[in-house]
């Protein structure tokens, strides 16, 4: 199967803790170096720009990505799901990100946008307003058609590192890699069932501490399993990435999963038992996985977006 690698949020969301010595710039450079080691250049990164408001020095991460031979797309400013904003507010948020990194986006061969969390809204009219704005701004939506819920590991890995729990750290790395491999296969199988053939998958990984420690292993496993890496531009030429599956009210469903929902076909998810093992690994007081995401990231994000908090895991 052909796979286009994309990286989201190498500058992670406000409120997400990082181990001492781990910085967005360090993560960005590490991931770029790993990609280069595997012969991958011109990889698109999509990182929201909100943290530049409080720390303009973080621009060094976006610049480092481009300097390493990769491309940038627009991922909104706030990283709020479209369902939390009106169409006009969301379009303005896209424009704000453009104002901050548009000069770097312009260096890419194609102008791509990615919806925050790949959540393209709950109504066709609102999404249509945004899609019209994207076209007028010269952007195409670059959806996600393969992921593995990698955000699930962020807080547990932080806990394992800061508590020096080497057994938990090893388990988290192993399950992260095996889930990346297993979920890619599951998404490829779903695509074959939906479209009757292999499609070039657009794969997502976030810029996290655990990604810097495992991305090379994941890419090696992909190659061993017959993956051919292709540029995002090639993957975007497939009709599955031109069309838009019907909107729905589900949370955290990617482009391919939304096709499956519309077709009434089961969609791939992490095994619930594995999910439970991961989110409870290396417990540290005050750093429960769901609580950290909700209290430190999602609820403040809703407040910044002027939205009532509305979220389902």
Summary of predicted features, one role per range:
Residues 1-119, 203, 221, 235:
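Active-site beta->alpha N-cap acidic-glycine motif
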Residues 17-18, 51-54, 66, 80-104, ...:
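Alpha-helical scaffold elements lining the catalytic groove of polysaccharide deacetylases
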Residues 36-39, 142-143, 194-197, 205-313:
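C-terminal domain-boundary segment and adjacent tail
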Residues 58-61, 88-90, 156-160, 243-249:
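Short low-complexity, flexible loop/linker segments enriched in glycine and/or proline
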Residues 61, 129-130, 217-218:
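A short acidic, amphipathic alpha-helical/loop segment
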Residues 71-74, 100-105, 165-184, 253-274, ...:
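Short, basic, helix/turn surface patches
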Residues 73-75, 139-144:
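Non-cysteine beta-strand/loop elements that form the S-adenosyl-L-methionine
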């Amino acid at each position: 199967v052909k796979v286009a690698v994309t990286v989201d949020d190498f500058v992670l969301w406000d409120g997400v803790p990082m181990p001492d010595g781990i910085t967005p710039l360090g993560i960005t450079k590490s991931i770029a170096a790993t990609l280069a080691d595997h012969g991958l250049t011109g990889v698109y990164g999509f990182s929201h720009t909100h943290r530049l408001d409080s720390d303009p020095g973080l621009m060094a991460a976006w610049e480092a990505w481009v300097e390493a031979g990769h491309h940038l797309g627009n991922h909104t400013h706030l990283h709020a799901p479209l369902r939390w904003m009106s169409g006009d507010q969301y379009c303005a948020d896209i424009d704000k990100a453009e104002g901050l990194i548009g000069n770097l986006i312009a260096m890419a061969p194609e102008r791509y946008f990615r919806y925050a969390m790949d959540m393209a809204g709950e109504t066709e009219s609102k999404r249509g307003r945004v899609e019209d704005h994207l076209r007028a701004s010269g952007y195409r939506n670059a959806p996600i058609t393969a992921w593995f819920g990698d955000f699930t590991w962020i807080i547990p890995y932080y806990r394992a590192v800061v508590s020096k729990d080497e057994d938990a750290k090893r388990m988290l790395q192993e399950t992260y890699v095996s889930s990346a491999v297993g979920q890619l296969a599951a998404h490829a199988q779903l695509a074959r069932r939906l479209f009757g053939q292999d499609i070039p998958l657009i794969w997502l990984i976030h810029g996290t501490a655990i990604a810097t420690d495992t991305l090379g292993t994941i890419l090696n496993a992909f190659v061993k399993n017959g993956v051919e890496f292709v540029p995002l531009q090639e993957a975007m030429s497939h009709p599955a990435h031109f069309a838009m599956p019907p909107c729905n009210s589900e949370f955290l469903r990617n482009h391919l999963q939304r096709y499956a929902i519309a077709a009434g076909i089961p969609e791939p998810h992490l095994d619930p038992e594995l999910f439970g093992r991961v989110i409870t690994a290396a417990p540290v007081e005050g750093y429960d996985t769901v609580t950290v995401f909700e209290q430190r990231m999602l609820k403040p994000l809703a407040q910044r977006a002027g939205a009532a908090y509305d979220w389902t895991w």
